[in-house]
């Protein structure tokens, strides 16, 4: 897999590389609200719609899964047709999901609306990643610096935004905050005009991958959801069949949704492991930390959001630094150091239940999230042919989001048998894996 071809002129921003990075970050950033901000609203959702806690949890689970699938699917659409087509169709899907969520009369309709909304939000994330990856090599580091700084601000401010909208307005607005990406779409269309390759989309493969991911997440939450034995067996069979079908699809088709050449790329596999560790640690922390601060330290939701805001500053600075360090060992060592520091903070939180260590752990998770996007986008952009970058980055981010779903699902399953603070010590294994895997990325990026 090669390449570092210069981007077509149509993809270069006339307003400068840093401005382009900010616009692409504004396109991607609101997707973060779909999980972290929405989590703040779950108690109000359950009360208003008379839903059980396990049913309300699907407001987050369905969103995380659909966001990953949408990112991969619209990434392939961008490669096949154009980034512009992907953004326009995704905008329609995102707007439709927003309307469904705002008018949903019950929890089932709301979950369906969130699935639609997240699928459209996936078009925004894949578009932002594809635009960043398609920039000229000499501009890419500056674009990625601005991109990473912007999404760091969104990620750290998500809980505060969720608290403000839920407390002062309505939980329904909190659940549709990802629709803010629509405001950035017109600012990115000019750069998204390049035509795609025209290769067909493998919708069958996409469906198999979606079913496999959903079955896997449901199996992890078997205990928490109280699923009967028959349902568990059915899910296990579905997972086995969908994985088997996907493997057959990969081996039998050159245009499969998951390209064989991508799976054989060491850089892709190592980047996936790194991102899964970071996202799983962050999602698990965002499940537990706000609840601990509210229940045990008696913080208000607004105080939790405000306390996590410094993470925006840390993440913005570190992601800009990572953007300048791409192409060598510096960026991978930076990410490894951040992930390792998160491990220490999570273990300290489990041991002491100190509020400061809880805030630091979550803030480091935000920083690792932003830096991971910068490093993995730069790494894959230099190795993947431009005509396949959108799909490759979409699939990579699908693994990240499924990893995040695994982290929150494990934390949710363990909460029935142990304290939230103890859970933090267990989920620290995720950023530990990321810290070790990140060290292997530097050699691949040279």
Where are the regions a protein language model picked out?
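Glycine-rich segments within core transmembrane alpha-helices of 12-TM secondary carriers
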Residues: 145-159, 399-407
């Amino acid at each position: 897999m090669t390449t570092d071809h210069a981007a077509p002129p149509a993809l270069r921003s006339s307003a400068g590389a840093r401005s382009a990075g900010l616009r692409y970050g504004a396109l991607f950033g609101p997707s973060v609200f779909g999980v972290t901000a929405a989590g703040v609203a779950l108690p109000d959702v359950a009360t208003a719609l008379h839903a059980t806690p396990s049913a309300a949890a699907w407001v987050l689970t369905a969103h995380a899964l659909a966001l990953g699938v949408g990112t991969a699917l619209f990434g392939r659409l961008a490669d096949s047709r154009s980034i512009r087509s992907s953004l326009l169709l995704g905008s329609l899907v995102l707007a439709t999901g927003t309307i469904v969520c705002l008018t949903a009369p019950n929890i089932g309709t709301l979950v369906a609306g969130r699935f639609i909304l997240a699928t459209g939000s996936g078009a925004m994330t894949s578009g932002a990643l594809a635009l960043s990856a398609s920039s000229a090599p000499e501009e890419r580091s500056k674009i990625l610096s601005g991109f990473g700084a912007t999404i760091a601000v969104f990620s750290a401010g998500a809980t505060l935004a969720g608290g403000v909208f839920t407390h002062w307005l309505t939980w329904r607005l909190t659940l549709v905050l990802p629709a803010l990406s629509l405001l950035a779409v017109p600012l990115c269309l000019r750069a998204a005009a390049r035509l795609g390759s025209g290769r067909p989309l493998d919708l069958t493969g996409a469906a198999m991958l979606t079913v496999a991911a959903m079955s896997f997440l449901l199996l992890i939450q078997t205990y928490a959801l109280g699923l009967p034995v028959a349902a568990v067996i059915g899910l296990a069979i579905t997972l086995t069949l969908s994985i088997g079908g996907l493997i057959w699809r990969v081996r039998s088709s050159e245009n499969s949704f998951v390209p064989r050449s991508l799976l054989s790329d060491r850089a892709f596999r190592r980047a996936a492991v790194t991102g899964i560790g970071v996202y799983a640690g962050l999602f698990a922390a965002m499940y537990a930390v706000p609840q601990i601060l509210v229940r045990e330290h008696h913080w208000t939701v607004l105080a939790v959001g405000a306390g996590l805001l410094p993470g925006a500053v840390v993440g913005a600075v570190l992601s800009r630094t990572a953007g300048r360090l791409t192409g060598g060992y510096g960026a991978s060592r930076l990410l490894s150091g951040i992930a390792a520091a998160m491990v220490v903070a999570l273990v300290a939180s489990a041991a002491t239940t100190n509020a400061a260590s809880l805030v630091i752990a979550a803030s480091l998770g935000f920083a690792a999230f932003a830096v991971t996007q910068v490093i993995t986008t730069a790494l894959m952009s230099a190795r993947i042919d431009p005509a396949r970058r959108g799909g490759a980055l979409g699939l990579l981010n699908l693994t990240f989001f499924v990893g995040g779903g695994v982290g929150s699902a494990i934390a949710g399953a363990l909460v029935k048998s142990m304290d939230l603070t103890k859970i933090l010590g267990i989920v620290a294994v995720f950023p530990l894996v990321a810290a070790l895997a990140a060290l292997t990325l530097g050699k691949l990026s040279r």
